[in-house]
């Protein structure tokens, strides 16, 4: 098993967007990383192309891929996968064994065997619908804010501290999810210290 690098992943995704070596130029992986940053593919991801790729980075890159314009422009990569529907995800449920997503623009059945945990309820975004079956493939939330992965050392009612000693202020009414259930930081922070 050889760990993939951020540069390798970015190169693959840039090629999926229609870019070729002759479009990029320069020295690999730096040239691909620079062009990927220009088109928004690496937003929220380390720009060190030689670093090992984490699962969180891979997930963020794929999410960014769905939002990124193809090389030809005028269309996002998501729209190459099927019909896209803009709206707010109001609820996700399962009825009769089939998962359904109810958007502000209509209700869609998920691809067979798929279900949603409801974590994206209330978010605005794009639903990708399979052109042949009419079933929902995935929901891509709009890019809201940023994220950072840290190793937690301790948590208090108004802050958390990582193992590097950095402290992050957290309002007690900040929404968090614990075991798939919505809660507030003030109610849920204690389980982090357990």
Regions found by a protein language model. Give the residues of each.
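N-terminal propeptides
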Residues: 2-159, 165-167, 184-190
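Short, intrinsically disordered, charge-balanced linker/junction segments flanking boundaries
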Residues: 174-175, 181-194
């Amino acid at each position: 098993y050889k760990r993939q690098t951020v540069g390798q992943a970015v190169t693959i995704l840039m090629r999926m967007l229609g870019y070729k070596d002759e479009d990029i130029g320069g020295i690999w992986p730096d040239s691909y990383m620079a062009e990927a940053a220009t088109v928004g593919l690496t937003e929220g991801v380390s720009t060190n192309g030689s670093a090992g790729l984490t699962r969180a980075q891979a997930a963020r890159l794929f999410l960014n891929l769905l939002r990124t314009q193809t090389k030809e422009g005028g269309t996002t990569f998501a729209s190459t996968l099927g019909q896209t529907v803009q709206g707010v995800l109001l609820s996700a449920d399962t009825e009769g064994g089939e998962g359904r997503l109810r958007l502000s623009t209509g209700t869609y059945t998920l691809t067979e065997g798929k279900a949603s945990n409801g974590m994206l309820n209330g978010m605005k975004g794009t639903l990708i619908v399979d052109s042949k079956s009419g079933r929902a493939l995935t929901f891509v939330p709009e890019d809201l804010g940023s994220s950072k992965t840290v190793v937690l050392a301790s948590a208090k009612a108004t802050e958390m501290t990582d193992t590097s000693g950095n402290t992050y202020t957290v309002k007690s009414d900040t929404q968090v999810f614990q075991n798939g259930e919505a809660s507030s930081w003030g109610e849920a922070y204690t389980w982090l210290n357990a």
